[in-house]
Every structure is written in structure tokens, then in C-alpha cells.
């Protein structure tokens, strides 16, 4: 029977000093011996997805205490990728994931907490906390802040739903007036919550449901809706029950590594492929799997992408649907339900809230179940009022979206495509693979070739796009922006958005060893591995080289013969210390980022730390 970890600091005469300090935090005599539950909150006023979280940690804490636990809250950092986008701030986004994971580990282990509630929401916060939970392997429950409501605006007499990406594209579209751009800006992000499309934040919060670590509705129930409060309260009750099952009943099935095992990672990736989630999820799932000792790789993602269909298209893949529409159609559980009916998921996986995923689907899938709580939960609708306050409205849809032929979520027979919404491509340009969000690619350019237009920074590519130097048919190639080369593997939302605004979104490709925002659509291929800074072929491409892309056959090829590539490699390596470095880039890299670059691995491995290098040092 495992002992409560917290007894290290709460029991025995020699721990009088530690108990004195615990008493100074508010603990009473009767609290020593109860499970101490750490609440990792990520409240910040910098991020709209987190501005409403300030009091929610204490909401969970009170519920923990009612259930017989002791709650102790702490906070992590949180970077807003949208605000950090398009300038040097983006260098810090991915590295912040590791800082978050470390900070959660530090706080939980330093204070010997028994269990963990993770209050996350936006892009790197959920992955960082997930990595920490897998690393710590103590009972854990995830509860996110919830999605933002979609914006609503009237442009040229027509009412449209919109999101952040629409505002970015409109800002550089010469056809849009200043007044219309201002209307987009003021309407794109109307409430608190994670941006309203199937971007990285919402994708990751959906995946925590599929992994079995979050409650039904976590990924799709709006931040503003009163029903979301119950998820926070339930998380507080649940974590105490899980802690007691582990420490008092020796039930290891409640631990993150027992729940989020290989089968659960397959379920999560299958969900991601089916819903056309952000390409960043590949990076984060690979990282979390490594933290938990799960042998889940790019090869597994490639295999799943060939058999799981695309059942859901949400912004940015289509302007028609946002997260509030996914929720009305039954959320993550209903997408998993459709995959279940096709035999494409593992039903027997455990979850924090149900004995198995199959049992959860039978209860919460609105197509198969008449469970009143499920029917009610998925009727939660947007309020349509700008606010930064959580749980501030109680609007309900008049009906659920059960149309699996033409609705937001499709069944297998009516899938958008038999191949899923994400694909792994291989070839001489990406020997270890690269990722494309096929759900956002126009069918006319699934097979594409063109001359490489070469850039060694995101900034240079943006200048060329806005300067009308990119032509239809070009392949914009941005290199030295990978985990080591950037460093930090910048997101390329602005280049892809500007291509769209210039009318080039369906006639050009963009390839990079960097990554893309969840808001990216178009023929955008990222995570090229090995990256240029690691000696990848992408570092040998020259201006005008022909690049061939064949998504149906999962192929990406640099049309340069092997002898020429070998000669280029010899010339590169002759540069000694200047080899595999950008030639004409002036970028200040801080000591913190240099340390990140020194330890990080390839995107094909999730850009986690290189344990081999650590072991050698």
C-alpha cells in the first residue's frame, strides 16, 4: 500500500518545523493525514484564455476540502501565442512548455503533494502540464478554462462568424477598408476563453478527454457558460476520490501512466486526425508520451492517419463551424462515438471519470444515449455578450446537432475524406517526417510542385510576401526555424495568413522546419525533420530547386539528384563552425534560449530534452 507522499512533511517529531510552516498556510490539526492536493493554476492577465481563471483555483480548492482533502494552489507562466506571434516573442513559446512542466514538477515534488489538478487552457500550458503529470505519475485531473465564443460581425451587410485568424488576414487584405478591419479586430475575440477555432489550445484540451484525464465536455464547453462551473466542482471531488483509491486502496489504475497508456495515445491521435486538429498536437503528444515512457512515435501517427477518416471540419479549415458548434454536436465524446462505431478506437481504456472509455461513450454520446445530463450539457450555447467573466451566461440551443450527414460532426459514411485531417509526409527533404494539416488543404493542391523560394527567417519570408515577391506556384521555404535553429521552433501563422490575404493560399505551398499555429490552413508543411540546424536536407535547398509534394502518397521530394546533394553537403561541412547555420540573419538569442537549443531534440521526437546528451554530461 503506497503511503501518502505528504506524510514525509506532516508526520513524525522531526517534521515539527515543516508542520509549523503548514500551519502558517492555514492547515489545522485535523488536516495532517488528509491528502494534499496541488492545484496548478495558470491564471494570467496576459492571455484571454486565462484571464478568467483567477478565482477558479479556489473554487476547486473548496470542493477538494469538502471532499476530505487539503488544497494548495500555485501558478505557472502562460504565453499568449497570438500576442507573441510574428516577432521575437515567438522564440519563447515552445520553450515555455518545458518551463511549465518543470515548474509543476518542482512545486509538486518539493512539497510532496499527493495528487494534482491542472487548470490549463492555452497552447503550451496544457501540454506542459500534461508532460508534468506523466512525469510525476500521481493522481491527476485536467480541467481547462474552456473555449472562447466565436465573434459575430456584420461586414458589407452580411453577418459572419469569425475568429482571430480572420482579423489577421483582413488586416493585410487591400480589399478591406480600415473600418472593416477595425470591425474584425473588435469582434474577433469577444470573450474570455481559448480562441474559438480548432486551434492548438482547443485541440489539446479535446485530447485530454481522449487520453482519459479530463471530464466529458472539457474540450468544447464554452468558458462563459454556467454549466462549465460544474466541471470545476466535479474535478475537485474527483481528485480526492482518485487519491484515496490510490493511497488507501492501492489502486494503480488511477495513475496517469495507467490511464494514458499506448492505447489511450492512439485514441487521442485518432481523435486529432478525425477532427483535423492543430499540427502542434503531434509535437505535444510525442513529448507527453516520452515523459510517460510510452513508445508512441511518428510511425504510429503515420499509420493512424492512413485509416482514420476526417469527420469534423472547424475553423480554420472552414468558416462555418467553431468550437461552440462542435459542442452542440456532442463534443469530443460524439467524435469518439463515431470512431467507436467504426471500430477505430480502444473502448477498454480507463478514464478518471468512468471505468472505461466505452462506458463513458455509452453514457455521454448524445447519438446513442438519452442520459439527461448529457443532453443538457451539450445544449450549452454562446451568450453573444462580450465578457471576461467565467460562467456568466446560461443560454441554450433549442436543439442538438444530431445531423451526421451534413452537420458539424459526420459519421463514417459521410466523412469529409477517408484519409484523416493530419498526415505525415516522408522523402529526401524530410527523412524523419514532416506534418501537414490536410483538413485545411484545398483538394486541388493535394499534389503540388514548384520552385523553392528560400528564406532563413520568418521575418524575411513575411517581407517577401507583403512585398509581392511571391508568385502563384511558388514553394515558400523557411528554414533554420526548428527547435535548435530558431531556436524555439516559431509558429508561422503570419506567413500563411498573409499568403491567404494576397490570394495565394490555394496556389502556393509553405514548407518549414518550424511549426504552424493551430490557426493555419492551406498547403502548410511543418516540423521538417531533421531540421536545417541538425544537418537536414532542408539546409541544402537552393533558390529555384523544384520541390514535389504528394499528400495522397505521403511523399515530399527535393528534385535534385543525389550526387548534387552530396556535393552540396561537402561544401556545407567545409564551412566548419559556420556549417548548418543561417547566412544572412541577425537575431539576438538570449542565454535562456541558447540553453534550450543546446538540449532540445528534433520535432520528430516532440522537441523534448535530449536525455542522451544529459546522460553524457
Swiss-Prot record:
Domain of life, per lineage: Bacteria
Cofactor annotation comment: Binds 1 [2Fe-2S] cluster per subunit. This cluster acts as a Lewis acid cofactor.
UniProt keyword list: 2Fe-2S, Amino-acid biosynthesis, Branched-chain amino acid biosynthesis, Iron, Iron-sulfur, Lyase, Magnesium, Metal-binding
Keyword Iron: yes
Gene3D superfamilies from the UniProt entry: IlvD/EDD C-terminal domain-like
Pfam families per record: ILV_EDD_C, ILVD_EDD_N
Record's catalysed reaction(s): (2R)-2,3-dihydroxy-3-methylbutanoate = 3-methyl-2-oxobutanoate + H2O; (2R,3R)-2,3-dihydroxy-3-methylpentanoate = (S)-3-methyl-2-oxopentanoate + H2O
Cofactor field: [2Fe-2S] cluster; Mg(2+)
Chain residues that bind [2Fe-2S] cluster: 122, 195
Active site, renumbered: 517 (proton acceptor)
PANTHER family: D-XYLONATE DEHYDRATASE (PTHR43661), D-XYLONATE DEHYDRATASE YAGF-RELATED (PTHR43661:SF3)
Protein name as annotated: Dihydroxy-acid dehydratase
Organism: Nitrosococcus oceani (strain ATCC 19707 / BCRC 17464 / JCM 30415 / NCIMB 11848 / C-107)
Organism phylogeny: Bacteria, Pseudomonadati, Pseudomonadota, Gammaproteobacteria, Chromatiales
Amino acid at each position: 500500500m503506497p503511503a501518502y507522499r505528504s506524510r514525509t512533511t506532516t508526520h513524525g517529531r522531526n517534521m515539527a518545523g515543516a508542520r509549523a510552516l503548514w500551519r502558517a498556510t492555514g492547515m489545522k490539526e485535523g488536516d495532517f493525514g488528509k491528502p494534499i492536493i496541488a492545484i496548478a493554476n495558470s491564471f494570467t492577465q496576459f492571455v484571454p484564455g486565462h484571464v478568467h481563471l483567477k478565482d477558479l483555483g479556489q473554487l476547486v480548492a473548496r470542493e477538494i476540502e469538502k471532499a476530505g482533502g487539503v488544497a494548495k494552489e500555485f501558478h505557472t507562466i502562460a504565453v499568449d501565442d497570438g500576442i507573441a506571434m510574428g516577432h521575437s516573442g515567438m522564440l519563447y513559446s515552445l520553450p515555455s512548455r518545458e518551463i511549465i512542466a518543470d515548474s509543476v514538477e518542482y512545486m509538486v515534488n518539493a512539497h510532496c503533494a499527493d495528487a494534482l489538478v491542472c487548470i490549463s487552457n492555452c497552447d503550451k500550458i496544457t501540454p506542459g502540464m500534461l508532460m508534468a503529470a506523466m512525469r510525476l505519475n500521481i493522481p491527476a485531473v485536467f480541467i481547462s478554462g474552456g473555449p472562447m465564443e466565436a465573434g459575430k460581425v456584420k461586414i458589407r451587410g452580411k453577418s459572419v462568424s469569425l475568429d482571430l485568424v480572420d482579423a489577421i488576414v483582413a488586416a493585410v487584405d487591400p480589399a478591406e477598408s480600415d473600418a472593416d478591419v477595425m470591425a474584425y479586430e473588435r469582434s474577433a475575440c469577444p470573450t474570455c476563453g481559448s480562441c474559438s477555432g480548432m486551434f492548438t489550445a482547443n485541440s489539446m484540451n479535446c485530447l485530454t478527454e481522449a487520453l482519459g484525464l479530463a471530464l466529458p465536455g472539457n474540450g468544447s464547453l464554452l468558458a462563459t457558460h454556467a454549466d462549465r462551473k460544474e466541471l470545476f466542482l466535479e474535478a475537485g471531488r474527483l481528485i480526492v476520490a482518485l487519491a484515496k483509491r490510490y493511497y488507501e486502496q492501492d489502486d494503480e489504475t488511477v495513475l496517469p501512466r495507467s490511464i494514458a497508456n499506448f492505447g489511450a495515445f492512439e485514441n487521442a491521435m485518432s481523435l486529432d486526425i478525425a477532427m483535423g486538429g492543430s499540427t502542434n498536437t503531434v509535437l505535444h503528444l510525442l513529448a507527453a508520451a516520452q515523459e510517460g515512457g510510452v513508445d508512441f512515435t511518428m510511425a504510429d501517427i503515420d499509420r493512424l492517419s492512413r485509416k482514420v477518416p476526417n469527420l469534423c471540419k472547424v475553423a480554420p479549415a472552414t468558416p462555418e463551424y467553431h468550437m461552440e458548434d462542435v459542442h452542440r454536436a456532442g463534443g469530443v465524446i460524439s467524435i469518439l462515438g463515431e470512431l467507436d462505431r467504426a471500430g477505430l478506437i480502444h473502448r477498454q481504456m480507463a478514464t478518471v471519470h468512468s471505468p472505461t472509455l466505452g462506458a463513458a461513450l455509452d453514457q455521454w454520446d448524445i447519438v446513442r444515449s438519452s442520459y439527461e445530463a448529457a443532453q443538457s450539457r451539450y445544449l450549452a450555447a454562446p451568450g453573444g455578450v462580450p465578457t471576461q467573466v467565467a460562467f456568466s451566461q446560461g443560454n441554450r440551443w433549442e436543439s442538438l446537432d444530431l445531423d451526421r450527414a451534413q452537420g458539424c460532426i459526420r459519421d463514417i459514411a459521410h466523412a469529409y475524406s477517408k484519409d484523416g485531417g493530419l498526415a505525415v509526409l516522408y522523402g529526401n527533404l524530410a527523412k524523419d517526417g514532416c506534418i501537414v494539416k490536410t483538413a485545411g488543404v484545398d483538394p486541388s493542391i493535394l499534389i503540388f510542385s514548384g520552385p523553392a523560394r528560400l528564406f532563413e527567417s520568418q521575418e524575411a519570408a513575411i517581407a517577401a510576401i507583403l512585398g509581392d515577391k511571391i508568385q502563384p506556384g511558388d514553394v515558400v521555404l523557411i528554414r533554420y526555424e526548428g527547435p535548435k535553429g530558431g531556436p524555439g521552433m516559431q509558429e508561422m501563422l503570419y506567413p500563411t495568413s498573409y499568403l491567404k490575404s494576397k490570394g495565394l493560399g490555394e496556389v502556393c505551398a509553405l514548407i518549414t522546419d518550424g511549426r504552424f499555429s493551430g490557426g493555419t490552413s492551406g498547403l502548410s508543411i511543418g516540423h521538417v525533420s531533421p531540421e536545417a540546424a541538425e544537418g537536414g536536407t532542408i539546409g541544402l535547398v537552393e533558390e529555384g530547386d523544384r520541390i514535389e509534394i504528394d499528400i495522397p502518397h505521403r511523399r515530399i521530394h527535393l528534385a535534385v539528384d543525389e550526387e548534387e546533394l552530396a556535393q552540396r553537403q561537402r561544401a556545407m561541412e567545409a564551412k566548419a563552425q559556420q556549417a548548418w547555420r543561417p547566412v544572412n540573419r541577425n537575431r539576438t538569442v538570449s542565454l535562456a534560449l541558447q540553453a534550450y537549443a543546446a538540449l532540445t531534440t528534433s520535432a520528430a521526437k516532440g522537441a523534448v530534452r535530449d536525455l542522451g546528451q544529459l546522460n553524457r554530461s
